[in-house]
């Protein structure tokens, strides 16, 4: 029997391999048993050969795991694989996507600091920026993310951090990543990009100058709606410094089990995103000509107001389609509920990036916490519907949507 005490470092991947290949093979470590699948290290703590080794491990003088809230071998493999896919210097896994968002900003901001954020955000991200960070003494200034002149005005004074989603959830508004990053850096700010809608397969922020990228691993990375998880990617100094300190002492750590599940998700991420992206494009085109639909927001539709920007900074429109029903606003909620309830294949759920196609009414679910004024400011009315396109046959999905709209 092979000695299981040793860890085998895998052969280095050849230069120039694709993200799909990295997703399957990147960062893998094998124990002495030479298993084909990554090992799942379900342990809370670790033992030391001597008290001196324990002391040096806690002092950071030895490369030794000390406690799974600080680090775990399975979690480390997940971090390394995602880092390689993204092309980032370093990565840190978190318990959820919102833990990643909060930690990434908390590691940059303190009392008296200034944050400039796009107004069109996921509901919980909006609450973090508008309510929670201000309790720490952080000033948050919101701008319309698709209006570069507003970014210019907001970043004309010293600022510590910038935060945005692009495409935004659910309105699919885009931020010109390169232009805003240039403005932010001139103002002294670090740029945090929430890349959950695009995934690293369709958009990469680091080549465009961003400092930090965050993900909800719960979405496309898992891809089957099984576990929660998140990740923060940035330079080594940022990850090993303020991010690690905040994570270590506040505790939103990823579990080894969740990391193992997410590793399985990374293996199929490229092929899933490719299929769902192509399917979403067809569904968006179908909805764009439907008589019951007022407008469709999908970055790779020529009718999208920022279509040219989408083509520049994305390699696909993504897996999410947002549309508004063509009906009076006073009956829009009722009409939207009727449409959702009539779908027979597509499930009503607030998640996205799943193998199963999912539909939600953002105003009463994911963005309820924004309140009526916050939703109105980003154009999110009661007739807006968001579909996360999964892996089912595209024709079957279109038939289901058409039936629900009839």
Curated annotation (Swiss-Prot):
Pfam families: Cys_Met_Meta_PP
UniProt pathway annotation: Amino-acid biosynthesis; L-methionine biosynthesis via de novo pathway; L-homocysteine from O-succinyl-L-homoserine: step 1/1
Top-level taxonomic group: Bacteria
Cofactor(s) the protein requires to work: pyridoxal 5'-phosphate
Molecular functions (GO terms): carbon-sulfur lyase activity; pyridoxal phosphate binding; transferase activity, transferring alkyl or aryl (other than methyl) groups
Record keywords: Amino-acid biosynthesis, Methionine biosynthesis, Pyridoxal phosphate, Transferase
GO cellular component, one term: cytoplasm
N6-(pyridoxal phosphate)lysine PTM sites in chain numbering: 219
Record's cofactor remark: Binds 1 pyridoxal phosphate per subunit.
Keyword Amino-acid biosynthesis: yes
Catalytic activity: O-succinyl-L-homoserine + hydrogen sulfide = L-homocysteine + succinate
EC class (word): transferase
Documented EC number(s): 2.5.1.-
Record's keyword annotation contains Nucleotidyltransferase: no
Function field: Catalyzes the formation of L-homocysteine from O-succinyl-L-homoserine (OSHS) and hydrogen sulfide.
PANTHER family: CYSTATHIONINE GAMMA-LYASE, TRANS-SULFURATION ENZYME FAMILY MEMBER
Subunit structure, interactors included: Homotetramer.
Name of the molecule in the record: O-succinylhomoserine sulfhydrylase
Gene from which the chain derives: metZ
């Amino acid at each position: 029997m092979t000695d299981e005490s040793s860890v085998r470092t895998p052969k280095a991947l050849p230069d120039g391999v694709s993200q799909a290949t990295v997703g399957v093979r990147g960062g893998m470590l094998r124990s002495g048993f030479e298993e084909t699948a990554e090992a799942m290290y379900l342990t809370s703590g670790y033992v030391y050969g001597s008290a001196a080794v324990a002391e040096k491990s806690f002092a950071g003088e030895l490369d030794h795991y000390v406690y799974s809230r600080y680090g775990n071998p399975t979690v480390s493999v997940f971090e390394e694989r995602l880092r390689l896919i993204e092309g980032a210097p370093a990565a840190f896994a978190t318990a959820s996507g919102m833990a990643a968002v909060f930690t990434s900003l908390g590691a940059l901001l303190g009392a008296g600091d200034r944050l400039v954020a796009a107004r069109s955000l996921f509901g919980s991200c909006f609450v973090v920026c508008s309510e929670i960070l201000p309790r720490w003494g952080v000033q948050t200034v919101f701008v319309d993310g698709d209006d570069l002149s507003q970014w210019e005005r907001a970043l004309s004074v010293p600022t510590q951090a910038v935060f945005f989603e692009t495409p935004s959830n659910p309105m699919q508004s885009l931020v010109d990543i390169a232009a805003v990053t240039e403005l932010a850096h001139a103002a002294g700010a670090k740029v945090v990009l929430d890349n959950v809608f695009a995934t690293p397969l369709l958009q990469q922020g680091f080549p465009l100058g961003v400092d930090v990228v965050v993900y909800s691993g719960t979405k496309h990375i898992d891809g089957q709606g099984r576990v929660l998880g998140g990740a923060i990617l940035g330079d080594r100094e940022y990850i090993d410094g303020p991010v690690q300190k905040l994570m270590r002492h506040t505790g939103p750590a990823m579990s080894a089990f969740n990391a193992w599940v997410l590793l399985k998700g990374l293996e199929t991420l490229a092929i899933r995103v490719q299929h769902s992206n192509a399917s979403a494009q067809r569904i968006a085109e179908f909805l764009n000509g439907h008589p019951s639909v007022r407008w469709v927001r999908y970055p790779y539709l020529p009718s999208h107001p920022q279509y040219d920007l989408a083509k520049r900074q994305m390699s696909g429109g993504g897996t999410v389609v947002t549309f508004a029903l063509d009906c009076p606003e006073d009956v829009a909620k009722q009409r939207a509920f009727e449409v959702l309830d009539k779908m027979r294949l597509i499930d009503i759920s607030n998640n996205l990036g799943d193998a199963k196609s999912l539909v939600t009414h953002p105003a009463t679910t994911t963005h309820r916490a924004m309140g009526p004024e916050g939703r109105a400011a980003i154009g999110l009315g009661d007739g807006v519907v968001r579909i996360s396109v999964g892996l089912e046959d595209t024709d079957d999905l279109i038939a289901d949507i058409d039936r629900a709209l009839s």
